[in-house]
Amino acid sequence: MSERTAYVERNTLETQVKVTINLDGTGKARFAIGVPFLEHMLDQIARHGLIDLDIECNGDLHIDDHHTVEDVGITLGQAFAKAIGDKKGMTRYGHAYVPLDEALSRVVIDFSGRPGLTMHVPYTRAVVGKFDVDLFQEFFQGFVNHALVTLHIDNLRGTNTHHQIETVFKAFGRALRMAIELDPRMAGQMPSTKGCL
């Protein structure tokens, strides 16, 4: 099996982002982003997706977190697209339900080649610590647009905003893990009746 790894750098006047990813990892993670709550959520992707992630970002945090959060999502999406390659032998679809106390979220993903995000998370607070929770929409939109995936995110219940968000990211990690899994029965085959994705 060839290694499914990628390194992507993205530099703008607002941020400089570096992402290293191993899709067949063990869940190791290292972050130097400067947004602790985002780093905590990215750790859920690595741990529950069994994906090794190393992300550095030098962003304009003196303004706010917006550009950093969005650009990390964009660059992570680019890294996924690069690491996955031609998608042959890949399961393609993934889904997961994850609870955390009173909160429950569902995430469904399709590495379809068609970017689309449908996200319904009725946050009970606008801010967790100092983090504006609306920025997670920007993170996932950036990821979707550049990983070229269809992604459905639904928080089905929850009263604690931290729990709502954490269940989303844990479910996202587990859905990714399912979707990127290589199926030996599909070795060398495209997971589509069209023959391409």
Swiss-Prot record:
Asked whether the keyword Cytoplasm is assigned, the reply is: yes
Under the GO molecular function aspect, what terms does this record hold?
imidazoleglycerol-phosphate dehydratase activity
Q: EC top class, in one word? A: lyase
The keyword Protein transport belongs to this UniProt entry's keyword annotation: no
Per UniProt, subcellular location reads as: Cytoplasm
* SUPFAM superfamilies in the record: Ribosomal protein S5 domain 2-like (SSF54211)
- Pathway, per record: Amino-acid biosynthesis; L-histidine biosynthesis; L-histidine from 5-phospho-alpha-D-ribose 1-diphosphate: step 6/9
A GO cellular component annotation here is: cytoplasm
Assigned protein family: Belongs to the imidazoleglycerol-phosphate dehydratase family.
The name this protein goes by in its record: Imidazoleglycerol-phosphate dehydratase
Q: What organism does this protein naturally occur in?
A: Stutzerimonas stutzeri (strain A1501)
Q: Which gene encodes it?
A: hisB
